[in-house]
Amino acid sequence: MLSRTIRTQGSFLRRSQLTITRSFSVTFNMQNAQKRSPTGIVLMNMGGPSKVEETYDFLYQLFADNDLIPISAKYQKTIAKYIAKFRTPKIEKQYREIGGGSPIRKWSEYQATEVCKILDKTCPETAPHKPYVAFRYAKPLTAETYKQMLKDGVKKAVAFSQYPHFSYSTTGSSINELWRQIKALDSERSISWSVIDRWPTNEGLIKAFSENITKKLQEFPQPVRDKVVLLFSAHSLPMDVVNTGDAYPAEVAATVYNIMQKLKFKNPYRLVWQSQVGPKPWLGAQTAEIAEFLGPKVDGLMFIPIAFTSDHIETLHEIDLGVIGESEYKDKFKRCESLNGNQTFIEGMADLVKSHLQSNQLYSNQLPLDFALGKSNDPVKDLSLVFGNHEST
């Protein structure tokens, strides 16, 4: 009886000691986090005009980007002004038709905030984590965000590309712009940067898309559900960019394949491409053309915007109002919900950032080749200038 009492008391003391130790550890980490400068988690994207009146500035910034549209730097700004002025009335009308502006800033700020909340709990060694958004062509521009980070005393930051699939014209452009702002605003290198430059097969990304597709399939009549064609639609690229060896098409295809694997290849599917403009050859097949071709031949068709992490004009207007809304087969067509505030997706983002922070890897092993192949008038000559010495893991 006495020995049992002693064992019970000993077990109680050990559990109490463990609880106190854990409590002390959490308190100690929280106190340390309060003393540390914040780790900036910066979601990089192209952005979009939050208000209709911001449309011209957005278009000008876009057409003036030599990484996106590689033409003679001597004439680019003049041409950008002309094209932006010409296209503004049409694009303003489209933004009015989807509610008066792009929702991309709203969703990006929400995603960044939620990711940082999770990271403060799961990755206390780099806490506190502070959310930022840096857009390439709309407010808040990279320069504006960088100035705010300096004011906030950020010493370490992760540039988190919201293009899951690398292209020199998108993620590459954001990195080049980051380098320009480092030179202009932070020559003493107050902030130490690393980058998540691609994540096409991230588990949370794949799972979130799979969940959304499965949910949307339930809206089709049961007899045709397994026959519904899944059209994965990504923003197209000019073929002259594709022919440089740009990684984008292969990485988009990797995402699609992983999703279909998750769904056990139950439905027929295709990868198609949207948003091409101008007379130059673009990567195809084109979303709208394939949809109209398949319309009379299939029992149902679902559009999945695969290269976007939230809704914006390409989903809300081009697909919803254009491809679906103007089709005579619209009764057969549905669009899968975008990722937006999907909790599975946000948790996947947080896991990705946590792994990145703990790896001490500054950028992926693919990035130097991406920049060697990319074409630009003002590129980063050496990635170590932006991110320091690359330590491969």
UniProtKB/Swiss-Prot annotation:
Q: Choose any GO biological process term that the UniProt entry carries and state it.
A: heme biosynthetic process
Q: Where in the cell is it found?
A: Mitochondrion inner membrane
User: What happens to this protein after translation, modification-wise?
Assistant: The leader peptide may be processed in two proteolytic steps, first between Ser-23 and Phe-24, second and by a different protease, to yield the mature protein.
**What's its top-level EC category?**
lyase
According to the lineage, what is the superkingdom?
Eukaryota
Q: Name one GO molecular function term.
A: ferrochelatase activity
Protein function:
Catalyzes the ferrous insertion into protoporphyrin IX.
More info: Ferrochelatase interacts with protoprophyrinogen oxidase, and associates with complex 1 of the respiratory chain.
Which family is it part of? Answer: Belongs to the ferrochelatase family.
- HAMAP family (alphabetical): Ferrochelatase
- This chain belongs to the protein called Ferrochelatase, mitochondrial
